[in-house]
Regions:
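C-terminal secondary-structure termini that scaffold catalytic or DNA-interacting sites
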Residues: 12-15, 50, 61-87, 93, ...
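N-terminal core-binding DNA-recognition domain of tyrosine site-specific recombinases/integrases
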Residues: 17-19, 126-133, 147-153
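C-terminal catalytic core of tyrosine-transesterase DNA break-rejoin enzymes
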Residues: 26, 30-37, 131-132, 136-143, ...
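Short, polar N-cap/turn motifs at the start of nucleic acid-interacting alpha helices
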Residues: 45-52, 148, 167-187
Length: 214
């Protein structure tokens, strides 16, 4: 995963990339979504007034079925996330870009999009293959000066940064859609211990100062 400085650098590098991939990667970093959850998003899932994202489904691929939508990984994966102001603004710009693309492409735009208005599609409005974003991100990382991380590492980065910022484990677990809090604790035990150590040091610093003043 990336640390705070590397994550900020990633966002800076994305400024020069196509808006569709800039939006996808930024959203993954800001929300901790799974790849399939990202690809399954529809515009009705976003409440721009309240800055909320409703995670309702996941997009998958099987050779015998092609790209299809399924329920989320588990019942707790069905969740509502609060979007950051930066993510909301980027989504608004991306929606304007997609609307202009629909007008430009015209009749070639997939009819099915009207019933299921996906955020992220092929050039003609069809469901995006989940591996498309994986392949793009792999190439992007190779030509960057960032560590060799995978697309799933963005989910770990999101969780690690939340923990480092002092977010409690139960909230992080709910945010990630984990079935059990113990899953979060097992995966991020090192980050949790580091955050606890930092909290202990901060408390020690405060109490030591109070003691000296007394």
């Amino acid at each position: 995963y990336l640390d705070e400085v590397q994550a900020a650098h990633l966002l800076d590098l994305l400024d020069d990339e196509p808006i569709v991939y800039r939006t996808m990667i930024t959203l993954l970093l800001h929300t901790g979504l799974r790849r399939g959850e990202l690809c399954g998003l529809e515009w009705d899932d976003i409440n721009f007034d309240l800055s909320l994202l409703d995670v309702q489904r996941t997009s998958l691929y099987l050779p015998e079925k092609g790209v299809f939508v399924d329920e989320t990984k588990n019942s707790t994966s069905r969740r509502v996330l609060k979007l950051t102001p930066d993510a909301v603004q980027l989504l608004k710009r991306y929606r304007m870009w997609q609307n202009s693309e629909r007008l430009r492409i015209g009749d070639q735009w997939a009819e099915e999009w009207e019933q299921h208005p996906r955020l992220f599609t092929t050039w003609d409005g069809k469901p995006l293959h989940p591996s498309t974003v994986t392949g793009w991100f792999h190439t992007f990382i190779e030509r960057s000066d960032l560590p060799p991380i995978s697309i799933h590492s963005l989910r770990h980065t999101n969780a690690t940064l939340l923990i480092a910022a002092g977010t409690n484990v139960r909230t992080v677990s709910s945010h990630l859609g984990h079935a059990q809090t113990s899953t979060t604790m097992n995966i991020y035990s090192h980050s949790i211990k580091s955050a606890e150590a930092a909290a202990a040091e901060a408390l020690q610093s405060v109490l030591t100062r109070k003691k000296k003043q007394a």
